[in-house]
């Protein structure tokens, strides 16, 4: 799908919103939909992240997948609020001079054109701050979990050799880094699941 087609995708999204209570969300009336411990998620948050996620993930919203994508957006927002609490508790910050680098990395790692994504968001009057919140949370969470778990991980030569057999284009160091990142991600996912299990989540 081209980026011009993604602009048309937003028209589909807007139709979906019109047929849903989410369509009523705007910057003057934010209805609280979910409480996550002491954090809130409003209908406006859900509407904005629903649209932005569909753009980033290159998904065409239909009557068949709309409800599923809505639930995924809600679950992602719950996870994001839990992540933000931990990020604040550990005082993880992204330095201003590093923010552009991390933002560019976010788009490049997903093979997305940053300028075109920004233009689509602007043309369709979506909230760019919602995208920036997602990016900053993702980057800060990665920094936090690396700090928490990196020192607990040990990669064996056998694991490295096995990966190199499957892909001989990798260097020894790159193979080790890939395996390390995978282990950090697994521990990060479990950490988030544990936080969610302990959280007080109230849907209104």
Residue ranges, per PLM feature:
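Peptidyl-prolyl cis-trans isomerase
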Residues: 27-31, 35, 40-41, 64-204
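Bacterial N-terminal signal peptides that target proteins for export
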Residues: 2-10
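Glycine-centered signal
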Residues: 1-2, 20
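Sec/Tat signal peptide C-region and signal peptidase I cleavage site
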Residues: 21-25
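Short, conserved catalytic-motif segment at the N-terminal edge
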Residues: 53-65
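Bacterial N-terminal signal peptides
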Residues: 10-19
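A short acidic/small-residue loop/turn micro-motif
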Residues: 48-50
